[in-house]
A protein has these predicted regions:
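Glycine-rich oxoanion-binding loops at beta->alpha junctions
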Residues: 45-100, 105, 137-152
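Gly/Ser/Thr-rich loops at beta-strand to alpha-helix junctions
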Residues: 11-15, 101-108
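Short beta-strand segments
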Residues: 8-9, 38-39, 70, 100-102, ...
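Conserved small/polar residues in nucleotide/adenosyl-binding loops
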Residues: 161
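Short Gly/Thr/Asp-enriched flexible loops that form oxyanion-binding sites at enzyme active sites
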Residues: 19-24, 105-118
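Short, acidic/small-residue loops that bind anionic groups at enzyme active sites
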Residues: 36-39, 114-137, 141-144, 148
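N-terminal phosphate-binding or glycine-rich loops at protein starts, especially the Walker A/P-loop
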Residues: 1-46
Length: 161
C-alpha cells in the first residue's frame, strides 16, 4: 500500500514542471497520501535534501518558471552502487513510490530505480521533445510558442519585410 510518495525534477528545467509538481502533490493529498519533495533531483536525493510538500507549498507555483524543487544533473547516478544508496534512502524516508519529472537522463535514472524494485513513475519534461512514447513532452509547446512570439515581436519592431 502506498502512503507516501516522493517527487523530483531532474536534468534541465522545462516550462510546466511546477504545474506537474502541483498536480501530483494536490492529487496525492486528495487521495490521503503524504508528499516529500526532493530538492535538486537525483543529486539532492543522494545528499538527503528533501522537504514535505503540502497544498500551501504548491498553491502559487503554477505560473512561475523553472521548478520549485530546483534541478541538477547527476553523473554519479549512473553507478549501480549510487542507485542502491538512493533506494535505501527512499526507504529510510518511508517513501513508497517516486514520481520523476525530467528528460531522457531522468528517465534512465527512474528506470534504474525501478529495476532495483522501487516503484517509479515518470512524467516526460524537456524542451527538446525527444522522448519516445509521447508526442509532446512537458515544456515543448510552451518553448516553441515563446520563441515564435519573440520572433514575431522582433519582426514587428523592425517592420516585416
Amino acid at each position: 500500500m502506498i502512503n507516501k510518495i516522493g517527487v523530483l525534477t531532474s536534468g534541465g528545467d522545462a516550462p510546466g514542471m511546477n504545474a506537474a509538481i502541483r498536480g501530483v502533490t494536490r492529487y496525492a493529498i486528495q487521495k490521503g497520501l503524504t508528499v516529500e519533495g526532493i530538492i535538486r533531483g537525483y543529486e539532492g536525493l543522494l545528499s538527503h535534501e528533501t522537504r514535505p510538500l503540502g497544498r500551501r507549498d504548491v498553491g502559487a507555483i503554477i505560473h512561475r518558471g523553472g521548478t520549485m524543487l530546483r534541478t541538477a544533473r547527476c553523473l554519479e547516478f549512473k553507478k549501480k552502487e549510487t542507485q542502491k544508496k538512493a533506494v535505501a534512502y527512499l526507504r529510510e524516508l518511508e517513501i513508497d513510490a517516486l514520481v520523476v519529472i525530467g528528460g531522457d537522463g531522468s528517465m534512465r535514472g527512474a528506470q534504474a530505480l525501478s529495476r532495483l524494485g522501487f516503484p517509479t513513475i515518470t512524467i516526460p519534461g524537456t524542451i527538446d521533445n525527444d522522448m519516445m512514447g509521447t508526442q509532446y513532452t512537458l515544456g515543448f509547446d510552451t518553448t516553441v510558442n515563446t520563441v515564435l512570439e519573440s520572433v514575431n515581436k522582433i519582426l514587428d519592431k523592425i517592420g516585416r519585410a
